[in-house]
């Protein structure tokens, strides 16, 4: 079942997110493309940080990516992500 994974990073600025985004892009380029199972990705500001919101085909794929790739990149930048919030996705549509 598809899931929405949300990771809140706080504190975190837009400049820090931009650095993270560049590192994630480099990682994806080295891996030959986006991670398997990623269906959509969005980031929005919240409070003194930002939230990474992604829809994954399966929770295990998203948790593995966050643990193996995203959290280490956050740590490289001195950022901390809170516990993932996981929600089931009942419907997903692409235009």
Predicted regions and their residues:
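Short S/T/G/P-rich N-terminal loop/turn motif that feeds into the first structured element of a domain
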Residues: 1-71, 79-95
């Amino acid at each position: 079942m598809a899931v929405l994974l949300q990771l809140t990073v706080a504190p975190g600025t837009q400049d820090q997110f931009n650095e993270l985004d560049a590192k994630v892009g480099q990682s994806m380029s080295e891996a030959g493309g986006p991670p398997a199972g990623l269906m959509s990705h969005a980031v929005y500001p919240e409070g003194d940080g930002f939230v990474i919101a992604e829809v994954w085909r399966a929770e295990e794929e998203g948790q593995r990516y966050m643990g193996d790739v995203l959290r280490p990149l956050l740590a490289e930048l001195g950022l901390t992500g809170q516990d993932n919030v996981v929600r089931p996705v009942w419907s997903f549509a692409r235009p």
